[in-house]
Amino acid sequence: MIEIIPAIDIIDGKCVRLSQGDYDSKKVYNENPVEVAKEFEANGVRRLHVVDLDGAASHHVVNYRVLEQIAVRTSLVIDFGGGVKSDEDLKIAFESGAQMVTGGSIAVKDPELFCHWLEIYGSEKIILGADVKEHKIAVNGWKDESACELFPFLENYIDKGIRKVICTDISCDGMLSGPSIDLYKEMLAKFPDLYLMASGGVSKMDDIVALDEAGVPGVNFGKALYEGHITLQDLRIFL
C-alpha cells in the first residue's frame, strides 16, 4: 500500500505552498507548522516531508528551528530538504531531528559531496531529489534547468547506492492538475527496486488511488490537503 507523506513547506517559519515553484505565488496556510504536523500525527500520519523554501533560495539551511520543534513535539518520521548544500547543513538537519535528508541541487552540482554523504550515512538516510521539467533536472529551488536528463541521472545514483527518490514533476506541482502517472510508471519499469515518492499534482483521492494502483511506493502532497480537496479522514484507508 502506498505510503502517505504530507508536505510542510516553510517560508519565514510559516507553512506555505507555491505553484510550480514560483515564490511569488506563495500562499500562507498556517503561521505555525508545528500545529499542522501535530494534526497530521493525530490522524494517523507517520511520515512527514519538510521543505525549507528559504533554504532552497539562499543555498543553506534556514528554518532548522521549525524542524527542531516538529521533531520534539511529534513522533513523525521526518525527511527534510531545501538548502542542504554542505556538510554543516547536513549536520544541522540531522541534529535538528530529521531522520532522512533529501539532496536535489547538490546531487547535480557537487556529485562527489552527495556521494560522500551516501557513503557516510547510507541509503536509508539520504534521499535523492529529482525535480523534473520535461525530463530535465531542475536546480536552485527549481529556478534553473540543468543539462541532466532524468533517466541517466537516476541510473548513475542508483548504481552508487541510492534507493529512495522523491520525484517532482514541476509542471504539476501546486497546480492540483493530477500527478504524472505515466512518468512514474516509466521510472518503476526501469528501476523496479526503487522506493519512489511521487510529488506534484495530487488534487483528489482518485489521484492517490491511481498512484497506488501504479505501484508507486510513496506520495508527497500538500496543497490538496490545505485547500480541503482531500481530508485527513479520507486518507485513513491508507494509514
Give the location of each predicted region.
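Glycine-rich, proline-tolerant flexible connector loops at the mouths of alpha/beta enzymes
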Residues: 47-65, 105, 167-177
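Catalytic cores of alpha/beta
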Residues: 74, 78-100, 182-221
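N-terminal beta-alpha supersecondary unit
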Residues: 15-61
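Conserved anion-binding
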Residues: 12-15, 20-24, 98-173
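Short, acidic/polar
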Residues: 29-41, 85-91, 145-156, 208
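Alpha-helix-loop-beta-strand connector modules within alpha/beta enzyme cores
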Residues: 57-79, 115-131, 176-204
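Conserved, mostly hydrophobic/aromatic
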Residues: 9, 40, 48, 93, ...
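C-terminal helical cap(s) of enzyme catalytic domains, especially alpha/beta-barrels
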Residues: 112-121, 212-239
